[in-house]
Amino acid sequence: MESPEKFTNSKEVIAFLAETFPKCFSIEGEARPLKIGIFQDLAERLEEDERVSKTLLRSTLRHYTNSWRYLYSIKEGANRVDLDGVEGDAIEKEHADHAKQQLDESKAKAAEKRKAKLAQQPKRKDKRQFNRPKGEKSANSDHADTKRGTKPKNNRPNTTPPAKLTDSDLQQGTQVTVKLGKAPMPAVITEVAKDGIHVQLDSGMVVKVNADALRLARSKRS
């Protein structure tokens, strides 16, 4: 009998844990604070499962508990849960403060990375518009005007371009638009994670995108 294929990354293990222990782990929505010592419980319950090693399990737990979604759940007085969802000790203020500090630091680092990435992107300029005397048209433009017999008109209404999201906008419930095809689609932020932003479209589908792909919905702007 062949051995089952082993998991190779944390994402696969988290999906497995959410399926095996749904009252403890989740991959979307609000996370639940984990019982202190949950690793030992997992190691014992999964001892016979050859698909996940203790090393990968440990790194997966670290990845899960460092996510923004999980850090949001660490509030003073909230109860931790075991693998079966049974509530246990309440979270102390010290632990809640530490989680908030981790969350703030992680958000700051993510903002710096986005800022650095934007700074590295070259400004797109239309070189054809440079060094052309004011009022002079290109040969192609003259030919097109002659052929049509009329001057080209821009019938598009003057609209304000959609606003980019600020750090304060990156939170659950923010109305946004996301460009998945030719036209932007309305969506709502459901989760803000280090590896991307989860948004839910009007169709109900949830997708993960980069913050750069999002714009603030017009209804949210003043």
Curated annotation (Swiss-Prot):
Any single Gene Ontology cellular-component annotation: cytosol
Alphabetical list of Gene3D superfamilies matching this protein: ProQ/FinO domain (1.10.1710.10)
Biased composition (Basic and acidic residues): 94-113, 133-148
A Pfam family of this chain: ProQ_C
Bias kind Basic residues: ranges: 114-131
Entry's family note: Belongs to the ProQ family.
Protein name: RNA chaperone ProQ
Source organism of the structure: Alteromonas mediterranea (strain DSM 17117 / CIP 110805 / LMG 28347 / Deep ecotype)
Lineage: Bacteria, Pseudomonadati, Pseudomonadota, Gammaproteobacteria, Alteromonadales
Gene: proQ
